[in-house]
């Protein structure tokens, strides 16, 4: 994966959105934006977006004087979707293909990404989830995934966003039912970045009671293997 030039405005706007969420003053936002631009001008765009922008979020945190600008958002979506966990499980139990239904919910949960959208509501998330769970997957590798899990001994499940990890938890429960032989670990970010999940988030929703949860040791908004 490489970083395309079209990614750059998005990265800058994400920093500005984070600053405005915390009601930072205009001079702070302007100075922060200048430093982000300087940082990006020195980077190799052949690297992946998570690797490229790791330093950007360090700049954002420095100017906003916080290590977790999206902390309130993360807590909100973890809490609200955890309240609906039993309803989502019922949807799965009532479906003809429980594995695929749980997978669809986990895919749909990826909409909770403040690195892509600056405004996301619970209503928007629930509407998207119900749309996706009733549609066919455009690229459907669910059978291939099922067969691979059947033949595997271990699974490293890479977590992504808060709120979304509630659906990951539900999907992992389904995987454990289908493949009790499988040894599963769930990986989260090494420190807070955007609304990505950390150890605290995984523990909050009880994922650690289901499978071992580990940190990837890095603060990029993704999994950059060479830095983990």
Labelled PLM ranges:
Residues 90, 94, 135-188:
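N-terminal active-site beta-alpha-beta segment that forms phosphate/nucleotide-binding
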Residues 167-217, 224:
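Redox- and metal-dependent alpha/beta enzyme cores, enriched for Fe-S-associated oxidoreductases
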Residues 226-228:
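Active-site/ligand-binding-proximal alpha/beta "capping" segment
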Residues 2-152:
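Electropositive, gly/pro-rich neighborhoods at or near active sites that engage anionic ligands
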């Amino acid at each position: 994966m490489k970083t395309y030039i079209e990614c750059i405005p998005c990265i800058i706007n994400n920093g500005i959105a984070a600053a405005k969420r915390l009601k930072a003053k205009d001079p702070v936002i302007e100075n922060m934006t200048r430093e982000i631009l300087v940082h990006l001008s020195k980077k190799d765009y052949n690297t992946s977006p998570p690797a490229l922008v790791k330093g950007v979020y360090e700049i954002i945190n420095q100017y906003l004087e916080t290590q977790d600008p999206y902390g309130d958002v993360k807590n909100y979506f973890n809490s609200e979707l955890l309240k609906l966990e039993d309803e989502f499980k019922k949807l799965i139990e009532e479906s003809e293909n429980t594995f695929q239904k749980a997978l669809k919910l986990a895919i749909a949960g990826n909409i909770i990404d403040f690195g892509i959208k600056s405004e996301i509501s619970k209503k928007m998330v629930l509407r998207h989830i119900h749309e996706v769970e009733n549609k066919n997957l455009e690229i459907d590798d669910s059978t291939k995934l099922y067969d691979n899990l059947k033949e595997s001994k271990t699974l490293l499940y890479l977590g992504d966003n808060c709120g979304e990890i509630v659906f990951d938890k539900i999907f992992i429960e389904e995987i454990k039912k289908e493949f009790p032989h499988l040894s599963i670990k769930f990986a989260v970010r090494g420190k807070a970045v955007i609304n990505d999940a950390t150890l605290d988030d995984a523990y909050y929703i009880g994922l650690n009671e289901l499978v071992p949860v580990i940190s990837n040791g890095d603060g990029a908004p993704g999994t950059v293997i060479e830095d983990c």
